[in-house]
Amino acid sequence: MKIYFKMVAVAALCATFTSCFKDEAPNAECDIEEAFVSVSNAKEVFNNLSDTLLQVPSTTTDLTFQIKRKATVTNFAPQFKLTEGATISPANGSEHDFSKEPVVYTVTSQDGNYSRVYRVSFKKASVMVGDTVKFDFEHYVKANLTGLADFYKWQEKDGEGMQDVWGSGNAGFSLSAWDQPAEADPAIPIDGFDGKAVQLTTRSTGSLGKLVKMPIAAGNLFYGTFDLRNALADALKATQFGHPFNRKPLTVTGYYKYTPAKTVTDRASKVLEDVKDSAAIYAVFYRNHDDSGQKVVLDGSNIKTSNLIVAMADMDYVEPKEDWTEFEIKFKYLTDIDLDVLEQNGYSLALVFSSSKQGDRFIGAIGSTLCIDKVRIICEKEKK
């Protein structure tokens, strides 16, 4: 029987929180938790040895190993850490040719009742064409984790199809919104300035949210991934910000509309008198490996404070606007970039949009709405 996350199920939810949400857990779990690969000449194939290991968020089914542009190896034998008792087909550690298309793996739960499909790719680092990277938010789908409500997620198209590069709190919101349609999500598609856009709205998480002192869900969308396993245990760790980016960003532009709601509350649902809600629009460019060579992904706890941050573009005050309004934010660099590190995909870019700036700490006004469209990252032109 499926768990539907009513108030009486909170204790069970915290104990059985996985992406196959069944009350038969753990034998109904069917996830890849880690993926790793071993090759004899790893330094010739990967930019960093840590790139041979992928930590897999619970909402992710497309796994991509990034390899060097000049790498000639096409056959790999990836291995997977699975949830307890699960099996995988093709066999764990079997060798395949990844040169033409992703290899599809199916993970089946120990009890045989549930399964999940993953696509695994080995991709050479791509060179971004032109000096402007465009995000128009035209591609979105409804996703579903077993036992939860449908929710919207956004994708970007590349040479191999649609890629899940955008994260949002929609999957986490679905924990408390099991009886609501996807249109009630904090992040939904709408008609935009041109084509489609994203509407971000701060929502109530209902009785369940209040019980665990997470009474609101700010509408957010970010260039990164959302790790559902941390949504209750450590909400700040659930937002994994950024993807490798091999250009030097100079400016972020786009269009927005913003209407703040009036009543701001805190984590205890106490009304904060004389406090106004505000939105967040910012970007962070950072080194994605530390001094010891370990892979780093910034999260909600350090996205603005990490010593790995190289540059930031922050729209400190998002002025309320009823009509589509153009914005432009310039990156402020704290240090020079290393061109060799840039060439090796050693920097990541995070873009963050939120209807309530302090929503990560569950402070905000239910109903505050931020709409975003036609975002552009203007980069330094490649020197010939």
Model-derived features: positions:
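Extracellular carbohydrate-recognition regions
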Residues: 125-169
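Short carbohydrate-recognition loop motifs
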Residues: 188-208
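Beta-rich interaction/scaffold domains
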Residues: 21-135
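Extracellular beta-strand ligand-recognition surfaces/modules
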Residues: 270-282, 325-369, 374-375
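Extracellular-facing segments of soluble proteins and assemblies that are Gly/Ser/Thr-biased and enriched
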Residues: 207-291
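Exposed low-complexity, polar/acidic, P/S/T/G-rich flexible segments that act as propeptides
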Residues: 122-124, 365-384
